[in-house]
Regions:
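PAPS-dependent sulfotransferase catalytic core
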Residues: 1-77, 211-219
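Flexible, charged surface loops at secondary-structure boundaries
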Residues: 4-6, 80-88, 171
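Residue-level detector of family-conserved "landmark" positions at structurally sensitive sites
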Residues: 37-39, 179, 206
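Generic detector of well-ordered alpha-helical segments enriched in charged/polar residues
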Residues: 47-51, 55, 74-82, 122, ...
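Electropositive, surface-exposed helix/loop patches at the edges of structured domains
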Residues: 65-86, 158, 162, 225
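PAPS-dependent sulfotransferase catalytic domain
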Residues: 87-204
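C-terminal accessory extensions appended to soluble enzyme cores
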Residues: 205-228
Length: 228
């Protein structure tokens, strides 16, 4: 039997381009271990696990009723943590794919705390259209398979698929909170402060100083919207 982790995980998920990387950075500043991850706080090895699991489902979105539970998923994850000597640390996983296969993760870690990161649908779509690596709906064949012509219609479908998962997660009673990072654009850190407290962590007073400059572009957009 593999040694049990000391702390239940914190799962950070949401549709791509919703601000989950920003939230992961805040948790990192509060001492939460993210593992051997890329610049977007996505664990490189565990991402390989999830991508392999999702590869046979259309667009990587399985119907929850059709999901199968791998027998040794938790053991595989904690095997990674053993290698990283992280069994005794507060730890998080951040990935959009967590929501797509939430029932697998919930079976493995029923006491995990979930952060569902939200952003206005139109803003997510516009961000996907402008982001070079978000290419799935630049492929006309992919659009055709869903009965769409325009790329933005594909991204609207994409966001709605995530929203279905979020509803399922909440209705299933997962221990989760919904976070809207855009509140921090106007200097409102109250929701984030409460979340850090809910997670049993200590607030880092340097967070606004570090995060505020990262929100300048969003702040400019908001000012332009208010002036239009």
């Amino acid at each position: 039997m593999i040694k049990k982790v000391e702390y239940d995980p914190i799962f950070i998920t949401g549709a791509e381009r919703s601000g989950s990387t920003l939230i992961a950075r805040i948790l990192d500043m509060c001492g939460v271990y993210s593992g051997r991850c890329n610049g977007m706080y996505e664990h490189t090895t565990i991402t390989e696990f999830t991508n392999d699991y999702l590869k046979d489902f259309p667009f990587g979105f399985p119907e929850t009723k059709d999901i199968y539970i791998p027998a040794h998923w938790r053991e595989a994850i904690e095997g990674v943590l053993i290698v990283e000597q992280a069994l005794n640390k507060h730890w998080m996983l951040k990935s959009a794919t967590l929501a797509r296969m939430w029932s697998v993760w919930n079976y493995a870690y029923p006491d995990a705390k979930w952060l569902i990161i939200r952003r206005r649908t139109g803003d997510v779509i516009q961000s996907c259209l402008k982001t070079g690596y978000m290419r799935v709906f630049k492929n006309q064949q992919n659009l055709n398979s869903l009965g769409f012509v325009k790329e933005e219609d594909g991204w609207l479908w994409w966001v709605h698929e995530y929203e279905k998962k979020f509803v399922e997660m909440i209705q299933a009673g997962l221990n989760c909170r919904v976070i809207w990072p855009e509140r921090m654009v106007t200097g409102d850190y109250h929701q984030m402060y409460e979340t850090i407290e809910w997670l049993g962590l200590k607030w880092n007073n340097d967070i606004p100083k570090v995060i505020d400059p990262l929100l300048n572009k969003s702040r400019e957009v908001l000012i332009n919207e208010n002036n239009s």
